[in-house]
């Protein structure tokens, strides 16, 4: 089941991360971040991404609110880090 955290279409190349340190030094333009849960540390690295897919995360969390205000699409999908792999094309409407 897909739940929308922040409205918008997500289209891009998947990058699955276990922790925020996994994305340091990586070009995130046109990427869709796949992560277990939303984290405030992630916020400063979000502006060039196409969207986020999370396994966990509350609709009213600080990070969720930020994503909506920044118009960054975010969907919650159970077991997303097991479903998606790095480099595949992702499209969610």
PLM segments and residue spans:
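Amphipathic alpha-helical
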Residues: 1-6
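Acidic, glycine-rich flexible loop/linker segments
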Residues: 7-32, 36-93
């Amino acid at each position: 089941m897909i739940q929308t955290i922040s409205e918008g279409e997500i289209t891009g190349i998947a990058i699955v991360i276990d922790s925020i340190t996994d994305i340091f030094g990586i070009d995130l333009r046109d990427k869709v971040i796949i992560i277990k849960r939303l984290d405030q540390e992630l916020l400063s690295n979000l502006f060039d991404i196409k969207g986020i897919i999370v396994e966990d995360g509350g609709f009213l969390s600080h990070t969720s609110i930020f994503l909506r205000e920044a118009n960054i699409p975010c969907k919650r999908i159970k077991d997303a880090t097991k479903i998606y792999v790095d480099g595949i094309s992702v499209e969610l409407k």
